[in-house]
Amino acid sequence: MLTTMQRVHNKPIDSIGGFKHLVKQSNGGDGGVTATDMQEPSIETDKLSYEIFSILESKFLFGYDDDLKLMESRSRDPSPEQETASPAMVEALNGVVPGTVKNQRGKVCVLSIDSGGMRGIIPGKALAYLEHALKSKSGDPNARIADYFDVASGSGIGGIFTAMLFASSDGNRPIFKAEDTWRFLAMKGKSFYNKSPPGILNRVMKTGSGGSGGSGSKLEKAMKESFEELTLKDTLKPVLIPCYDLTSSAPFLFSRADALETDGYDFKLWEVCRATWAEPGVFEPVEMRSVDGKTRCVAVDGGLAMSNPTAAAITHVLHNKQEFPFVRGVEDLLVLSLGTGQLVDVKYDCDKVMKWKAKHWARPAVRISADGAADTVDQAVSMAFGQCRRSNYVRIQANGSSFGPCKPNIDTDASPSNVNMLVGVAEEMLKQKNAESVLFGGKKINEESNYEKLDWLAGELVLEHQRRSCRIAPTVAFKQSGDRRVDQQTIFKDIDCMF
């Protein structure tokens, strides 16, 4: 080992300051080493070897010149005063001490938003509160969700919220605030859902849901007004927005990482949003092509493919070593998953349900399936995090409400009364105790409320953001044009393995 280090430093061993002196001290002063010493190294010899290697390592990596002083500082145990940074240093870096974080890998921050139609008001209110908490804890009145999350995934209405929060017209700041998400749905939802759809299939779906149809043209107009000619490349951070492709009979992920590699995977954002919210029986399917016209997709609701896209986002990070080179496992992630509410108080009249035919079960079956799938993903992700789930994974979900039974068409009812009820459910949800999935233990009610959990998360996000300026290596290295694409089939394969 020493011979190798000699070659690295290009100088003889005895020219390294203090080395001869150390050898003489450890061997009685004459510098001689007996055969017994070679065969049975003492504790002092082992300690000496460690100190020598530390000196060589420090000289090679950091250029220290005073080796004896360095060795003495290493041999002393740090006092409590030495371990604590001065108040001035803490204040200068907002509580971040450079020496304490330079060797940490940091955490990749992930945001995921479920599908759920008008129930999207619930996660929208949670996003608005989180952004407010980020402004408060960072001291930055212009703080945005996109400043603190590295990856975002959203399905259905969650996909539209994701695009709103991360799309940028100038490549610097997002177009929308978090408050705009739920207000967009509350104010414009009625224009999307107030039209009775034509066609036999849509009439069947309408009959089964007991609710209204939708106007795809008005939704399309709203998306065009919001995003104009922006594409997936125009998002500030990696985004993942799913749909179900009828041409391939498989899920399809719209991905910024793919779009940066080739125009064949770059789509206009308004089309992406229209596709992920193309609920069967409510909005028409969307035939769309990539910006270069080479990739064709006939898309329907992303909620059919993955109502809870958290697993897709996590898998994307774990396999994307170009953008997230230092992630070794879920312990290096900080994940926020927002649900659209498990409203178990949906009212079904037993006598009527007993007489339902297949057409009547259409929309209720879709809703039950989507909510069940979202909960299954939550359970699987929680199991994957294991013992670190409380510090690395946060799920915010409404579990019932005090507003009484909900209508079966709560997802598509944009009436003022339903909107007001959903706003009330969202505010009540933030006050509810946070519930987490426990390995083989169902749901566990925590002592913290969802408000408190989001406050804690905001603090962690701000701290992670500050620490990154003090680290030697970057936590993230976002992809530029021409980089290798993460294969979608790999992502879907690993999602399947989680179950």
Curated annotation (Swiss-Prot):
Q: What does this protein do?
A: Possesses non-specific lipolytic acyl hydrolase (LAH) activity. Hydrolyzes phospholipids as well as galactolipids. May play a role in disease resistance.
Leader peptide range in chain numbering: none
Which CDD domains is this protein grouped with?
Pat17_PNPLA8_PNPLA9_like
The listed location of motif GGXR is 116-119
Keywords, A to Z, come to: Hydrolase, Lipid degradation, Lipid metabolism, Plant defense
The GO terms this record gives for MF are:
hydrolase activity; lipase activity; phospholipase activity
Q: Which domain of life is it from?
A: Eukaryota
User: What GO terms in the biological process aspect are recorded for it?
Assistant: defense response; lipid catabolic process
State what protein this is by name. Answer: Patatin-like protein 6
Catalytic residues identified in the record = S155, D301
> Per the similarity annotation, which family is this?
Belongs to the patatin family.
Motif residue range(s): DGA/G: 301-303
| Domain called PNPLA: residue spans | 111-314
Annotated SUPFAM superfamilies: FabD/lysophospholipase-like (SSF52151)
Query: Domain note for this entry?
Result: The nitrogen atoms of the two glycine residues in the GGXR motif define the oxyanion hole, and stabilize the oxyanion that forms during the nucleophilic attack by the catalytic serine during substrate cleavage.
Q: Which PROSITE patterns match?
A: PNPLA
Q: Return the EC number.
A: 3.1.1.-
Tissue expression, as annotated, is: Highly expressed in siliques and at lower levels in roots and flowers.
In this UniProt entry, which cysteines form S-S bonds?
A: none
Q: What class of enzyme is it?
A: hydrolase
Q: What is the scientific name of the source organism?
A: Arabidopsis thaliana
Q: Which gene encodes it?
A: PLP6
Q: Which GO terms describe its cellular component?
A: plasma membrane
